[in-house]
Amino acid sequence: MSDLKAAALRALKLMDLTTLNDNDTDEAVIALCKNAKTAVGNTAAVCIYPRFVPIAKKTLREQGTPDVRIATVTNFPHGNDDIAIAVAETKAAVAYGADEVDVVFPYRALIAGNETVGFELVKQCKEACGDILLKVIIETGELKEEALIKKTSQICIEAGANFIKTSTGKVPVNATPEYARMMLEVIRDMGVAKTVGFKPAGGVRTAEDAQAYLAMADDILGGDWADNMHYRFGASSLLTNLLNTLEVTAETADPSAY
């Protein structure tokens, strides 16, 4: 197997296969769940809006892939600074049966100089999650500056985040290798590689992209770090490219381009 094929297979099993469109339907989510099961293995998770968690759970169970985890989003996509709403949404996501919650950090408040609200929001959402995995989206493309990206990553980790995630996929600039490096360096420098993972999201579209991101993680945190409890790709169109690289066809084409 070529290096690119090996990276493609590795990336496929680390994917949070995503649909977060305003016009999503039960049918779209069922199709997404079907795509999570491939001839070469399953994606790590599907990522969907909270209201679709029950239909996703039913579909994954019926197709014999209950090990595919269900991630959902809260405080999404704007990252508002109302802690009570973010916590209520997170509690609702848990009640729906989500295995993982991706919450948006109140990044605009941080840009304006308020570090406290973000820490409290993440801390209380993690308390609402209990053992459920909490990924925190910091919206790197809006923070832009290295100092802000590193500070936000640090706040999230100190507040109890299980993962730090680059982006919502809903702003002009989403995951970039430069931003990924900054966030991985925070995980390394804080000594939390055992307990904190990383998720680039939005803009990872090809096997070559995924290979470069994984090589960076291997370089910074070691070759055995990026397993599915420490690394995820938030993507949709990536899956088709990975399957093409592996010379496998998907059951249904995914028209989204997250």
Curated annotation (Swiss-Prot):
Q: What GO terms fall under cellular component here?
A: cytoplasm
Q: Does the keyword Nucleotide-binding apply?
A: no
Swiss-Prot/TrEMBL catalytic activity: 2-deoxy-D-ribose 5-phosphate = D-glyceraldehyde 3-phosphate + acetaldehyde
Q: What is the E.C. number? A: 4.1.2.4
* UniProt keywords, alphabetically: Cytoplasm, Lyase, Schiff base
Chief localisation class:
cytoplasm
A Gene Ontology BP annotation from the UniProt entry: carbohydrate catabolic process
Q: What class of enzyme is it?
A: lyase
Question: Which GO terms fall under molecular function for this chain's record?
Answer: deoxyribose-phosphate aldolase activity
- Identify the SMART domains for this entry: DeoC (SM01133)
Compartments where found? Cytoplasm
The protein's annotated pathway: Carbohydrate degradation; 2-deoxy-D-ribose 1-phosphate degradation; D-glyceraldehyde 3-phosphate and acetaldehyde from 2-deoxy-alpha-D-ribose 1-phosphate: step 2/2
Would you say which domain of life the source belongs to? Answer: Bacteria
Where does the record place the catalytic residues? D102, K165, K199
A Pfam family (short name) is DeoC
Q: Which HAMAP family match?
A: DeoC_type2 (MF_00592)
Q: What does this protein do?
A: Catalyzes a reversible aldol reaction between acetaldehyde and D-glyceraldehyde 3-phosphate to generate 2-deoxy-D-ribose 5-phosphate.
Q: Which family does it belong to?
A: Belongs to the DeoC/FbaB aldolase family. DeoC type 2 subfamily.
Q: What is this protein called?
A: Deoxyribose-phosphate aldolase
For this protein's source organism, the top of the classification is: Bacteria, Pseudomonadati, Pseudomonadota, Gammaproteobacteria, Vibrionales
